[in-house]
Amino acid sequence: MNKTVIIGGGAWGCALGSAVLEKKTTPFILTSSPKRANDINNGKSSRFDDNDIQLKLKAGTKPKDILEGASVVILATEVDRVLSFIKAIKDFTNKNCAVLIASKGFGNKGEIIPLILKEKLKNDNIGVISGPSFAYEVIKKKPTALVVAGNKDIIKLTTDLFHSNKLRIYGSEDIIGTSISGAMKNVIAIASGIVYGLNLGENARAAILTRGLAETARLVEGLGGNFETVFGLAGIGDMALSSLSMTSRNFAWGYSLAKKLPFKNNLVEGLKASKMAIKNAEKLNLEMPITRFVTVTNQDNLDLKIEVEKMLNRPPKLEWIK
């Protein structure tokens, strides 16, 4: 029997676990928190205030115990922690174990995460799963569509693991474009939240989303991905969801900045992603004004309206420059 391990006991990890349960397979959750592991083992796996959610997942805190015998490992922890699990995966799993990245962002030097894993693990069975998906809706079995990028074996494995009449899985061979699109949607969501918080109107939000998509496409192509990926589930799909809803942490953070409101959740991936994206863009001589705007948004005493005006006062140009 195949053993599925999900690294990360947060909302997204448990949401993916709930989808695996639909296939009559019990996934194992690896978490660093003994309390969280205990909660999951006692059916309290949901991070949401919903007593109807009872997931029969198994969890533990010892990498060796959880990872040994795994045929699939899904990384669903914060992107900053993903690379810290490379050694454990290498030590306690078969060298051909499939590894799926469900976290969104860049490495600490702007690297593309799945490419780092391929190199460090000496394993070609690396994939990325992405797309428009709030964890709560996946857990509640609301219709959702995701894309998995990888080789044919990864696509088949992931489809067998997750695909149902509530969770559709589409395949892609573009690991680079899928990974970058997932990181960039958080960047554009922050910008969209700021525009919304400044009451600049729906026209402006539509413009931010569309031009943010153009910036993403530029970066994807520049780093070796496929232009078309940006117009799929990992790109426009996820970007639209995250840029138009207060359920998105990154959108909510941008909105809170604009309104000068306190923000409790410190997991805002888009700020770091913006800085890593600009690092890559500068190497490639790419223009990414919205992304660059997001890099400075957390500076003290910054007037966001003035920064938006700077973007609007840029010289006119063609919509698409190849």
Where are these regions (language model features)?
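Conserved active-site and cofactor/substrate-binding residues in soluble primary-metabolism enzymes
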Residues: 7, 11, 15, 35, ...
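NAD(P)-dependent Rossmann-like dehydrogenase/reductase catalytic/cofactor-binding core
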Residues: 192-193, 221-231, 235-322
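Catalytic phosphate-donor-binding core of small-molecule kinases
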Residues: 140-149, 153-164, 168, 205, ...
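Rossmann-like NAD(P)(H) cofactor-binding subdomain of soluble oxidoreductases
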Residues: 53-55, 60-141, 160
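NAD(P)+-binding Rossmann beta1-loop-alpha1 motif at the extreme N-terminus of oxidoreductases
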Residues: 1-61
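Active-site-proximal catalytic alpha-helix in oxidoreductases
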Residues: 142-147, 176-221, 232-249
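Rossmann-fold dinucleotide-binding core
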Residues: 106-201
